[in-house]
Amino acid sequence: MADMPSVEPTRIDPKLLELLVCPLTKGRLEYDSARQELISRSAKLAYPIRDGIPIMLPEEARPLAD
């Protein structure tokens, strides 16, 4: 059986993270490297990062549990 290549998590440039805001609340975002998401606590949404690109569309975001 062939070994599967390991997928290294994407790293977000800290300067980019300073510039990005939640499109709904304009609040700051937190980077969750384990889940590859940008978290908006104010909107209670987690925006996915796919292939190193943050998907900042509310309809693509995952609702956060309370």
Curated annotation (Swiss-Prot):
SUPFAM superfamilies listed in its UniProt record: Trm112p-like
Highest taxon, organism lineage: Bacteria
Family annotation (InterPro entries): Trm112-like
GO cellular component, one term: cytosol
Membrane-spanning parts: none
Annotated Pfam families: Trm112p (PF03966)
Family: Belongs to the UPF0434 family.
Matches recorded under HAMAP family: UPF0434
Protein name: UPF0434 protein Mnod_1613
Native species: Methylobacterium nodulans (strain LMG 21967 / CNCM I-2342 / ORS 2060)
Upper taxonomic lineage: Bacteria, Pseudomonadati, Pseudomonadota, Alphaproteobacteria, Hyphomicrobiales
